[in-house]
Amino acid sequence: YYASRGLGDVYKRQGGYFSGPKPVRLLRRLLTLANLGENDIVLDFFSGSATTAHAVMQMNSEDGSNRKFILVQLPEVCDEKSEVYKAGYRTICEIGEERIRRAGKKIKEESPLTTTKLDIGFRVFKVDSSNMEDVYYRPADVKQAQLDLFADNIKPDRTPEDLLFQVMLDLGITLSSSVDEEMLDGRKVFSVADGYLIACFDKDVTDETVKAIAKRHPFYAVFRDSGMANDSVMANFEQIFETYSPQTQRKVL
């Protein structure tokens, strides 16, 4: 009863409830018994309608903490006869995402004075194959005319954001870190964790682009191999960083 009522508060306009949701009140009680620290991370590997996220945000709003949550859920398809399917949600994951949005908004609306700094943002990821092409061929199997086909080792359907988050995982950078986009020398650049990592995956990257990034003195700088405007830029790449930011760790995809 309390579970459906709690979810109903968030989905009251949808005309139906999620089947068998966990009650927010129960999750909050369990989290309290766990004696969580103010910056702890809560994991839920059967997240369903994202009640755990709702409970964590509610607790943060009450005591000013900054706990985070990681939710994992298989993309189970909703019953076509259900109310949530009729409302446009195709998987349980989509329901959970909308639940988090609405719950966060509702918490802020109910306590505007005490939730000004409450972080209700979240990111959604899915398990996928590598962004990199499978280019393992024996020399005897490759003809000279085919070499241009292997100039770019990144799959054509992958976005700059896909590459960025793969790099963050490879470097052990928290996926909840701040990510800012800006233009440097006419190229889109990602600045992660206030410049700890700076990445540029655009095409036609010039010496000036590399120099502008090096002058920011990031701990990590990442570029796309095929993104360099010409061989000269690739040849000068290391020297530019040695001149302006020798301590920066450089990586090329």
What are these regions (language model features)?
Residues 19-26:
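N-terminal pre-P-loop "Q-motif" helix
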Residues 12-18:
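Class I SAM-dependent methyltransferase Rossmann-like catalytic core
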Residues 27-106:
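Conserved S-adenosyl-L-methionine
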Residues 84-167, 172-176, 181-184, 188-190:
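SAM-dependent methyltransferase catalytic region
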Residues 140, 160-162, 169-253:
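Conserved NTP phosphate-binding and transfer environment spanning the P-loop NTPase/kinase superfamily
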Residues 45-47, 56, 71-76, 126-128, ...:
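Active-site proximal loops enriched in glycine and acidic residues that flank catalytic Cys/His/Asp
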Residues 1-11:
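Single conserved hydrophobic/aromatic residue that forms the stacking wall/gate
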Residues 7, 65-68, 120-122:
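Short glycine-/polar-rich loops that comprise or flank the Walker A/P-loop
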